[in-house]
């Protein structure tokens, strides 16, 4: 029974599972630094962070187990083809580094909060955070560049061309979707992550000036590269919307993915430009210098700040647009019904499926972007509206993450128990003996997939 349950669970692994870490993790970050702070919210953030860590460890272990079993049953080449060349799976590897970044950001916040209380522990934690950040950056680059190359290299003819006259037309009709952004958004996320700690006091005590400068430069290069790449893909997706129209009901929540680079990009550029100003103020003092040097020392950092503010507001403006379009698209399916072929159940747009998770992280990034704009510039110009918007986006993100988490736990517990029972009965029948494998076409396993199918989003 236990073996059947484990094998059934192993078969359900998909890189998309790390989306749960993203949603719960960013919720913990939002609660920790909520626009209207409260002690009980800080306590809730610790709980959400613990849940995010547990999910990350569990999914990581499941991924390793899935890899071992898959290679044992088939081969590494088939694993590579299925999970790195097949666009139903490879795009979702981007959720892994983004989920890890939410954990890194929370650990960085804890390190900064304990700078005076426990300097030694805070310093050691910051070093650990910095090492994790470099690991995450490496993973982001491998995924963004590697998966993009595999997609561009050739078509992966898993299902053939179907009713299309060529692979080109099939690609244009089926795969020009917002999920293409999932492999590039991690670059935006990891670039903004280093901005949260690079110029902090504890980072200054743990590392020298050269490390800070190198980190700032790499952060800037990563952010610029990612934003350009993102807008190229968004332009392609706009073309798809004009040609193929909005996604079908089961995929409509993927529209929210467009909010991710907008909110996180604004958050990142605000932190980056503010860190440049802090760096100049710290290492280029205005004492004993000429008037021209003093003007440059003051003007150059503020030029970056102004560019950061304008860029952030432009990205947030697009984020508001995508928010409205996404909500209206969902509402347009309110009266539509679909019947599942496998179970015959009637599905509505509000029937829970894994696509619901696609709304959590993007809403959280919009909260971070709005709140950071308020924090940095409210001292010069009243910007309370952005604080309110950050609260609204953050509240939706946290509540939606909790809803998705509870519904996911319910679906998994129900379907896994069902799959294990059916597999056990099937293998013990007197007429047919079958070795229960994660890759055998057993009826019970197929039935369990109906509500847990991640590939419908790709």
UniProtKB/Swiss-Prot annotation:
Q: Where are the transmembrane segments?
A: 12-32, 49-69, 90-110, 136-156, 177-197, 221-241, 253-275, 310-330, 351-371, 388-408
Q: Where in the cell is it found?
A: Cell membrane
Biological process terms from the Gene Ontology for this record are:
sulfite transmembrane transport
Judging by the UniProt lineage, the source's domain of life is Eukaryota
Cytoplasmic topological domain ranges are: 1-11, 70-89, 157-176, 242-252, 331-350, 409-458
Q: Which residues lie on this side of the membrane: Extracellular?
A: 33-48, 111-135, 198-220, 276-309, 372-387
The GO terms this record gives for MF are: sulfite transmembrane transporter activity
Q: PTM Phosphoserine: list the residues.
A: 444, 448, 450
The alphabetical list of record keywords is:
Cell membrane, Membrane, Phosphoprotein, Transmembrane, Transmembrane helix, Transport
Could you state one GO cellular component term attached to this entry? Answer: cell periphery
User: What mutagenesis or variant effect is reported for residue 345 to R?
Assistant: In strain: ATCC 76625 / YPH499, MMW1-15 and MMW1-2
The way it spans or sits in the membrane comes to: Multi-pass membrane protein
Q: Which family does it belong to?
A: Belongs to the tellurite-resistance/dicarboxylate transporter (TDT) family.
Protein's job: Involved in efflux of free sulfite. Mutations in the SSU1 gene cause sensitivity to sulfite.
Q: What is this protein called?
A: Sulfite efflux pump SSU1
UniProt organism field? Saccharomyces cerevisiae (strain ATCC 204508 / S288c)
Q: Which gene encodes it?
A: SSU1
């Amino acid at each position: 029974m236990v073996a059947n349950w484990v094998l059934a669970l192993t078969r359900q692994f998909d890189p998309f599972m790390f989306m749960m870490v993203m949603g719960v993790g960013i919720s913990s970050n939002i609660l920790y630094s909520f626009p209207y702070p409260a002690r009980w919210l800080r306590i809730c953030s610790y709980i959400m962070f613990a849940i995010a860590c547990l999910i990350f460890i569990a999914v990581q272990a499941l991924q390793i187990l899935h890899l071992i079993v898959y290679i044992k049953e088939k081969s590494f080449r088939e694993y590579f083809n299925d999970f790195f060349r097949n666009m139903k799976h490879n795009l979702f590897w981007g959720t892994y580094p983004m989920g890890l970044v939410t954990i890194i950001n929370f650990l960085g916040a804890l390190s900064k909060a304990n700078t005076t209380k426990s300097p030694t522990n805070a310093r050691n934690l910051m070093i650990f955070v910095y090492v994790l950040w470099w690991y995450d950056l490496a993973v982001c680059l491998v995924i963004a560049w590697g998966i993009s190359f595999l997609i561009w290299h050739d078509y992966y003819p898993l299902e053939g061309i179907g009713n299309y006259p060529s692979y080109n037309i099939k690609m244009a009709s089926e795969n020009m979707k917002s999920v293409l952004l999932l492999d590039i958004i991690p670059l935006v996320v990891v670039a903004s992550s280093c901005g949260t700690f690079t110029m902090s006091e504890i980072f200054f005590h743990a590392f020298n000036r050269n490390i800070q400068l190198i980190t700032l430069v790499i952060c800037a290069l990563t952010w610029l590269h990612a934003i350009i790449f993102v807008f190229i893909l968004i332009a392609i997706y706009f073309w798809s919307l004009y040609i193929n129209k909005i996604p079908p009901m089961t995929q409509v929540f993927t529209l929210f993915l467009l909010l991710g680079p907008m909110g996180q990009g604004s958050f990142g550029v605000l932190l980056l430009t503010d860190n440049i100003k802090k760096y100049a103020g710290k290492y280029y003092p205005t004492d004993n210098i000429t008037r021209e040097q003093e003007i440059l020392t003051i003007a150059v950092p503020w030029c970056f700040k102004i560019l950061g503010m304008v860029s952030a507001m432009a990205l947030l403006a697009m984020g508001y647009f995508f928010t409205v379009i996404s909500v209206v698209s969902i509402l347009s399916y309110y009266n539509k019904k679909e019947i599942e072929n496998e179970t015959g159940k009637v599905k509505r747009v509000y029937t829970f499926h894994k696509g619901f998770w696609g709304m959590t992280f993007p809403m959280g990034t919009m909260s971070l972007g709005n709140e950071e704009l308020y924090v940095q510039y409210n001292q010069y110009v009243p910007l309370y509206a952005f604080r309110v918007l950050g609260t609204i986006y953050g509240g939706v993100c946290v509540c939606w993450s909790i809803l998705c988490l509870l519904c996911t736990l319910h679906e998994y517990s129900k379907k896994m128990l069902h799959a294990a029972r059916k597999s056990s009965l099937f293998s013990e029948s007197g007429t047919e003996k079958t070795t229960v494998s994660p890759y055998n076409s057993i009826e019970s396993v197929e039935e369990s997939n109906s509500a847990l199918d991640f590939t419908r989003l790709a």
